Swiss-Prot record:
Important for receptor binding: annotated span: 58-69
Residues spanned by motif Nuclear localization signal: 109-130
A cellular-component GO term for this protein: cytoplasm
The entry's keywords: Calcium, Cleavage on pair of basic residues, Cytoplasm, Hormone, Nucleus, Secreted, Signal
Compositional bias ranges of the Basic residues kind: 123-133
Molecular function (Gene Ontology), one example: peptide hormone receptor binding
Propeptide residues, chain positions: 26-37
A Pfam family reported for this protein in Swiss-Prot or TrEMBL: Parathyroid
Signal peptide: 1-25
Protein name from the UniProt record: Parathyroid hormone-related protein
Length: 176
């Protein structure tokens, strides 16, 4: 008796959970379809997540750099056994970007602001390379190869493979 009553309650609970009940005249499936996002909304959320991740990475790297540069300076009057010569280095300030970069989504920002430090390209014709120098070297190599293959010297040499025989090609380069 107790078992049948418990079984009925459980089966009724399973029935209610598995059956989609209409709400305000629409089925539950219709409501869930309304929650699907548009492509632009997905892109917006993706860009927002990416900018947040970039901001976190920037903060993390800044904290790392601050931790590296806080070493104590030891005041020693001793001369080190192997003194190193002073290197010609310049100390540039470390900067990872503007402070307001993380506030805006990438679609909202002006892309040209990110690349301020790059020099502007001068529009005009490209300078042509001097004709002849590289091409002449290629021509010489081709002539040497064709002369070497046509002469038949590679068959009488110690090595049987013309690819591995460097002595003949070196000889031809010296002759030309």
């Amino acid at each position: 008796m107790m078992f049948t009553k418990l079984f009925q309650q459980w089966s009724f609970a399973v029935f209610l959970l598995s059956y989609s009940v209409p709400s305000y005249g629409r089925s539950v499936e219709g409501i869930s379809r309304r929650l699907k996002r548009a492509v632009s909304e997905h892109q917006l959320l993706h860009d927002k997540g990416k900018s947040i991740q970039d901001l976190r990475r920037r903060i993390f790297l800044q904290n790392l750099i601050e931790g590296v540069n806080t070493a104590e300076i030891r005041a020693t009057s001793e001369v080190s056994p192997n003194p190193k010569p002073a290197t010609n280095t310049k100390n540039y300030p470390v900067r990872f970007g503007s402070e307001d970069e993380g506030r805006y989504l990438t679609q909202e920002t002006n892309k040209s602001q990110t690349y301020k430090e790059q020099p502007l390209k001068v529009s005009g014709k490209k300078k042509k390379a001097k004709p002849g120098k590289r091409k002449e070297q290629e021509k010489k190599k081709r002539r040497a190869r064709s002369a070497w293959l046509n002469s038949g010297m590679y068959g009488s040499n110690v090595t049987e493979s013309p690819v591995l025989d460097n002595s003949v090609t070196t000889h031809n380069h010296i002759l030309r």
